């Protein structure tokens, strides 16, 4: 048979355990945030340009998204900090290129605006040093070994030997490399 003091002690320990778990859960949430609102910017340290870092080292990008707001009939542009940006971006050397691409000293990225903010996808096989946009084309980029259409590598197209066919407006119509012809859509 247990007495009241033992039950109270068990309840106190259970309550302490619950509070400890709650604190740990909050720490995890704070360390793995998908986004922070602008009012929470004091939790971040500005690195350079649009990039910020949290105390645990998570990289955030300051961006905008269009959101529905209660009582407003149209979408409202809201500024926030996106924590879903690739964590290996080098903010000190990151630069947006013409079109939907960007690069830093280590990698190249597909980088385009969406209604939810900037979409940033690392192009795993891209060589950052030789990566560049095809002149006047926001969808196409090349490095020394690959041709990219957005995030897709165009197979069997050699960027060193390809011929670019454009229409009267300067838009790419075809890429020809050896026996391979890529027809743009």
Regions from the PLM with identified roles:
Residues 2, 9-185:
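Non-catalytic tandem-repeat scaffold regions and their flanking low-complexity/translocation tails
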């Amino acid at each position: 048979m247990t007495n009241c003091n033992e039950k109270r002690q068990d309840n106190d320990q259970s309550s302490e355990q619950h509070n400890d778990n709650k604190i740990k859960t909050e720490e995890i949430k704070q360390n793995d945030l998908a986004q922070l609102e602008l009012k929470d910017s004091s939790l971040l340290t500005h690195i350079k340009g649009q990039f910020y870092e949290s105390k645990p080292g998570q990289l955030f990008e300051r961006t905008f998204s269009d959101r529905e707001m209660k009582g407003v009939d149209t979408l409202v542009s809201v500024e926030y900090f996106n924590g879903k940006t690739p964590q290996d971006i080098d903010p000190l050397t990151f630069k947006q290129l013409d079109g939907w691409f960007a690069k830093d000293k280590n990698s190249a990225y597909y980088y385009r605006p969406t209604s939810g903010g900037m979409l940033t996808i690392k192009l795993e096989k891209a060589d950052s040093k030789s990566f560049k946009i095809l002149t006047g084309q926001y969808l196409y980029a090349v490095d020394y070994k690959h041709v990219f259409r957005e995030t897709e590598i165009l197979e069997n197209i050699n960027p060193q030997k390809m011929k670019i066919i454009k229409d009267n407006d300067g838009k790419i119509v075809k890429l020809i490399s050896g026996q391979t012809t890529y027809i743009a859509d």
